[in-house]
Amino acid sequence: EFCRALKKSGCAMLKLGMESGHQGVLDALSKGIDLAEASAALRALHRAGIAVYGYFLFGTPPETEADAHETLDFIVRHSEYISFLNLAIFNLPAGSEEARSLSTQKFYEGDLSLYRSFLHPAGWQRGNVRNFIEKILKKHPAVAPIIRRTPEFFTSNHAPFFAFLKNSK
């Protein structure tokens, strides 16, 4: 009912920051996201004809490679409801609580960024995360079509104009 009202009001797309497909990771990060509710929302938005730009974050301190595979499974199970994907690698904010509890360093000498490189508690380093995203997740037969239709320089401001591409490619 709510999603149909959104569509009727002119909503063409919603960006949903689901972050992870593993409930334990979401709970450890205090995200307040329930995967059963996220699943129901994806289905309801699809039925209403509203495109979904799903945001998933990999390499957070509580995530393991096995957890990332569960996120892949979540995306695959919901692939018909996800129009576009934003797959990101976690950046550790320099002054965060996590930064104080992890072994950190600058990304490179002279780095003035707001983020720090860190030693992942489970050994799930950025290179491993990047390889997982590029070589496994993006190449999965259910995920690859979503990646292909997601514009390269995509921003949520422009996404509604590309919603019609949902079933192409």
Specify the residue positions occupied by each region the protein language model found.
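A structural motif corresponding to the C-terminal lobe/cap of the Radical SAM core domain
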Residues: F2-K169
